[in-house]
Amino acid sequence: MSNPQQLRYSKEHEWLSGAEDGVSTVGITEHAANALGDVVFVQLPEVGDSVTAGETCGELESTKSVSDLYSPVSGEITEVNEDVVNDPSLVNSAPFEGGWLFKVRITDEPADLLSADEYTAFAGA
């Protein structure tokens, strides 16, 4: 399992892209997607919602369990990926590409985000 080097990671197993015009893309890691099993339902925040780093902002339901989705940063939701709402299996098949979850205009970024190498060591992935 390979964690892209250009991303940063949370200990709740979300990834965060580098900000473009202050907006970053968020998804869950391949490690988290594999642990969940087949994702069958995705509940995302709505455009315009405020999210807080480390707080619940949605839900992922799989054939194994229901898991909370956490925001790795604080900010305002600017876009949600309707493709994963309509086809939740994208979370499993392409967690770092088409399976991204939402975009957020960052107002605060915690200092404890991990590099790819740090996340790999943390997750044992």
UniProtKB/Swiss-Prot annotation:
Note on how the cofactor is bound: Binds 1 lipoyl cofactor covalently.
Species for this entry: Streptomyces coelicolor (strain ATCC BAA-471 / A3(2) / M145)
Cofactor: (R)-lipoate
Assigned protein family: Belongs to the GcvH family.
GO-annotated biological processes: glycine decarboxylation via glycine cleavage system
The UniProt record lists the keyword ATP-binding: no
One Pfam match: GCV_H
Residues bearing PTM N6-lipoyllysine: 64
Gene3D superfamilies: 2.40.50.100
Lipoyl-binding domain location: 23-105
InterPro entries named among the record's database cross-references: 2-oxoA_DH_lipoyl-BS, Biotin_lipoyl, GCV_H, GCV_H/Fam206, GCV_H_sub, Single_hybrid_motif
GO annotation, cellular component aspect: cytosol; glycine cleavage complex
Assembly notes: The glycine cleavage system is composed of four proteins: P, T, L and H.
Role summary: The glycine cleavage system catalyzes the degradation of glycine. The H protein shuttles the methylamine group of glycine from the P protein to the T protein.
Alphabetized PANTHER family for the sequence: GLYCINE CLEAVAGE SYSTEM H PROTEIN, GLYCINE CLEAVAGE SYSTEM H PROTEIN-RELATED
Record-given protein name: Glycine cleavage system H protein
Keywords: Lipoyl
